[in-house]
């Protein structure tokens, strides 16, 4: 649909009644530039402009800015109202320039203060303004011709800016009612005409101007909708520079303009040709020139002397101009500019400098860091443009290194998985139409976006951020859970994957956990599995809204995560045992700074671990998942412990492990009596044989001898032998 906004047509209605000839009472020094006055000469008295002159100058400044920035498709029609309406130009492009308007205003001349005020009225101009808005412009006619049968789609909107001296608020309401009734009548006429267009939207801007020093009889009022077609706003402004400032603000509002102040412009002084001073020049342009670096938060705004909400201006610093016009800059946009104070010396110097083929680079002022060149001023075909330069990476530059991202090193990224991800989500031509469940046509591009969204709901980029995507056992589940719908076979495969993970946890299989950037051995095995289950649950929950079968997969996962109490007890004991082993290893490594523990404490710890192992074995035996152990003979414990030499220094890891093995073996059988009572590994045989007189003798009647105790493998036969009362060895 072709729409012409309110900015396409602007009608100025300026009051030419006798009271507009009154002075604005803002004095201007006439000969203030004369530096060397001859003594005895009386200076010229200051002058003041009339309300008419202030209104014409302000409206011409409005038109100048608009023509500078929008030379096409933004049209102005000028009407002077006194005893009748005088239309000074038309909507044709040939009449849209300041020279035509100023020549027409010169023929009108200033208002006659001696004319009859009763014969003059601003209503004549407002009625003529509505009539002018109904006329078709060249651009509207071209659009209607192109659309042909859809010509009614071309919109007709406009804006009326009326500068007058109202008597009161009731007078303002009367003017608004007049415009509303006139629009209603002319829309009826335009409906039956091929050369007129109905007004769809009209903005009425009433500006009440009065001399400086007087009280205003009209109050300001923001924009208000009077009807579906007409909106109105009222501004009460003092004449002189205040009126010029108000219209400067309005032109920014009406055409979406923004302000940029160029600072530190070096210019040579007239009085001192060898020195230079820095000046500032304020420029107006379309606000899109600030969009890019306003989003990045790099803008530095400063307040100017203007009033109203548009007093903010973006400050840019002058850089050394580049004289090489062949050098290319990566430019993202170019916008026409218009100086705010076009007649000032700094503005004139800057304009001439640019029109002579020079370019100026502009940088953002920063307190620290390197400078950022964000804009450039240059002329093309006699018109000056503000170019927006890209301060970020250019598509012409090399892409950023992957090491600058969140992963750091290149090897930290899941590059292989990402290649597979791109292969699964590549775009291909799709010619055959497909339909959704609700019988609506499925757009291939939207379907591709939807699939990409599903695949990226949970997709870690770095290897160290994931566990399940590093496990081959999880591939069957991770590959199908992203589907829009699952089959029964898919659900079965997901359940098998979950059961395999449960079996891995029961067997205490290691997981592929990355230890990059961590010290020590990393998290415990129990903690690794807890992280794995949490991540798997996150992946499944991200897709449970796809279908009901996705919910079944989640239910299976949650059911397998809930472990029986005996399993939790076994894991708890295992964690305690690992903690004690870690402490023992740490004590062995730090033997240079710590003393060895007493022998009794070490033996006590070994015995406690042995008891816990036995208790854990009983728990495993009672577990329904554990196999039945083979039948063994009951073990007999002894209350005696083998004599161990007391350590005289730090205890090594080998000593701790040997003591633990020896202690565990000593609990599994009854020690041979000879070894228990041996002295220096020598056992005396037949200790209980005595003569009748109490002397000890051997088997041959001679003195008893000591037989060295041989270190031989223990066997059930040897271990179960003992002496009897009559001195003969018996086997049990």
Swiss-Prot record:
Using the UniProt annotation, give all residue ranges assigned to the region (Disordered).
564-650
The PTM Phosphoserine maps to 623, 626, 678
**How is this protein annotated for GO cellular component?**
cytoplasm; INTAC complex; integrator complex; nuclear body; nucleus
Instruction: Write out the ranges of the annotated region (Cleavage module binding motif (CMBM)).
Output: 649-694
Indicate whether Cell inner membrane appears among the record's keywords: no
The protein's superkingdom reads: Eukaryota
Question: Where is the protein situated, by its record's location annotation?
Answer: Nucleus; Cytoplasm
Q: Which GO terms describe its molecular function?
A: DNA-binding transcription factor binding
Location of the motif Nuclear localization signal (NLS): 572-582
Could you tell me the keywords of this UniProt record? Cell cycle, Cell division, Cytoplasm, Isopeptide bond, Mitosis, Nucleus, Phosphoprotein, Ubl conjugation
Any Pfam family hit: Mat89Bb
Principal localisation: nucleus
List the GO biological process terms.
Answer: cell division; centrosome localization; flagellated sperm motility; mitotic spindle organization; protein localization to nuclear envelope; regulation of fertilization; regulation of mitotic cell cycle; RNA polymerase II transcription initiation surveillance
Q: How does it assemble?
A: Component of the Integrator complex, composed of core subunits INTS1, INTS2, INTS3, INTS4, INTS5, INTS6, INTS7, INTS8, INTS9/RC74, INTS10, INTS11/CPSF3L, INTS12, INTS13, INTS14 and INTS15. The core complex associates with protein phosphatase 2A subunits PPP2CA and PPP2R1A, to form the Integrator-PP2A (INTAC) complex. INTS13 is part of the tail subcomplex, composed of INTS10, INTS13, INTS14 and INTS15. Interacts with transcription factors ZNF609 and ZNF655. Interacts with PAFAH1B1; this interaction may be required for proper recruitment of dynein complexes to the nuclear envelope at prophase.
- Family, similarity comment: Belongs to the Integrator subunit 13 family.
| Function, in words | Component of the integrator complex, a multiprotein complex that terminates RNA polymerase II (Pol II) transcription in the promoter-proximal region of genes.
Report the domain remarks: The cleavage module binding motif (CMBM) mediates recruitment of transcription factors.
Name listed for the protein in its UniProt record: Integrator complex subunit 13
Source taxonomy lineage?
Eukaryota, Metazoa, Chordata, Craniata, Vertebrata
- As recorded in Swiss-Prot or TrEMBL, the protein's gene is named IntS13
């Amino acid at each position: 649909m072709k729409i012409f906004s309110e900015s396409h047509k602007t009608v100025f209605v300026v009051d030419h009644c006798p009271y507009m000839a009154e002075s604005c009472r803002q004095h201007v020094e006439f000969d203030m530039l004369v530096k060397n006055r001859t003594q005895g000469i009386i200076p010229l008295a200051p002058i003041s402009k009339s309300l008419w002159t202030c209104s014409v100058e302000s409206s011409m400044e409005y038109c100048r800015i608009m023509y500078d920035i929008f030379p096409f498709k933004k049209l102005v029609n000028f009407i002077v109202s006194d005893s009748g309406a005088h239309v000074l130009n038309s909507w044709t492009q040939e009449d849209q320039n300041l020279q035509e308007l100023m020549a027409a205003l010169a023929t009108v001349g200033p208002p006659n203060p001696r004319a009859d005020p009763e014969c003059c009225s601003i209503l004549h101009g407002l009625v003529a303004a509505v009539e002018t808005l109904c006329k078709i412009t060249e651009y509207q006619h071209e659009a209607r011709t192109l659309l042909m049968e859809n010509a009614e789609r071309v919109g007709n909107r406009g804006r009326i800016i009326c500068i007058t001296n109202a008597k009161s608020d009731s007078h303002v309401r009367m003017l608004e009612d007049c415009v509303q009734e006139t629009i209603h009548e002319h829309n009826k006429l335009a409906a039956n005409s091929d050369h007129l267009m109905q007004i769809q939207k009209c903005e009425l801007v009433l500006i009440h101007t009065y001399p400086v020093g007087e009280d205003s009889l009209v109050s300001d009022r923001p924009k208000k909708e009077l009807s579906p077609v007409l909106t109105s706003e009222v501004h009460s402004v003092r004449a002189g520079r205040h009126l010029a400032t108000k219209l400067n603000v309005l032109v920014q509002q009406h055409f979406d303009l923004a302000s940029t102040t160029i600072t530190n412009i070096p210019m040579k002084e007239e009085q001192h040709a060898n020195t230079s001073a820095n000046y500032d020049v304020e420029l107006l342009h379309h606000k899109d020139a600030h969009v890019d670096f306003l989003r990045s938060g790099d803008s530095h705004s400063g307040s100017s002397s203007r009033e109203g909400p548009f007093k903010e201006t973006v400050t840019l610093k002058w850089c050394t101009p580049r004289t090489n016009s062949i050098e290319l800059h990566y430019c993202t946009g170019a916008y026409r500019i218009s100086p705010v104070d076009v007649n000032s010396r700094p503005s004139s110097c800057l304009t001439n400098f640019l029109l002579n083929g020079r370019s100026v680079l502009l940088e953002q002022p920063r307190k620290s860091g390197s400078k950022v060149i964000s804009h450039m001023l240059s002329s093309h075909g006699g018109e000056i443009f503000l170019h927006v330069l890209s301060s970020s990476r250019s598509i012409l530059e090399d892409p950023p290194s992957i090491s600058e991202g969140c992963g750091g090193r290149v090897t930290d990224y899941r590059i292989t998985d990402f290649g597979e991800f791109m292969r699964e989500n590549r775009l291909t031509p799709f010619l055959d139409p497909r339909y959704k469940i609700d019988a609506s046509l499925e757009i291939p591009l939207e379907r591709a976006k939807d699939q990409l969204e599903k695949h990226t709901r949970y997709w870690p980029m770095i290897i160290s951020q994931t566990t399940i995507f590093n496990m081959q056992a999880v591939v069957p589940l991770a590959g199908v859970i992203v589907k829009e719908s699952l089959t029964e076979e898919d659900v079965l495969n997901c359940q098998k994957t979950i059961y395999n993970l449960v079996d891995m946890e029961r067997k205490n299989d290691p997981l592929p956990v990355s230890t990059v950037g961590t010290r020590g051995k990393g998290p415990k095995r129990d903690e690794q599995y807890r992280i794995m289950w949490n991540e798997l649950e996150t992946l499944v929950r991200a897709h449970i809204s796809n279908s009901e079968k996705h919910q079944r997969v989640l239910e299976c996962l949650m059911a397998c995560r809930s472990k029986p109490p005996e399993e939790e007890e076994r894991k708890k004991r295992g964690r305690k045992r690992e903690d004690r082993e870690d402490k023992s290893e740490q004590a062995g490594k730090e033997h240079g700074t710590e003393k060895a523990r007493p022998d009794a404490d070490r033996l006590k710890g070994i015995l406690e671990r042995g008891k816990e192992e036995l208790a854990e074995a009983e728990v495993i035996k009672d577990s329904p998942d554990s196999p039945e152990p083979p039948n063994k003979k009951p073990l007999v414990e002894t209350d005696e412990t083998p004599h161990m030499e007391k350590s005289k220094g730090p205890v090594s890891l080998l000593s701790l492990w040997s003591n633990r093995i020896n202690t565990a073996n000593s609990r599994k059988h009854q020690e041979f009596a000879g070894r228990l009572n041996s002295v220096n590994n020598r056992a005396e045989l037949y200790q209980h044989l005595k003569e009748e007189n109490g002397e000890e003798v051997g088997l041959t009647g001679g003195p008893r001898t000591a037989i060295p105790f041989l270190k031989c493998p223990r066997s059930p036969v040897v271990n179960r032998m003992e002496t009897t009362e009559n001195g003969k060895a018996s086997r049990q």
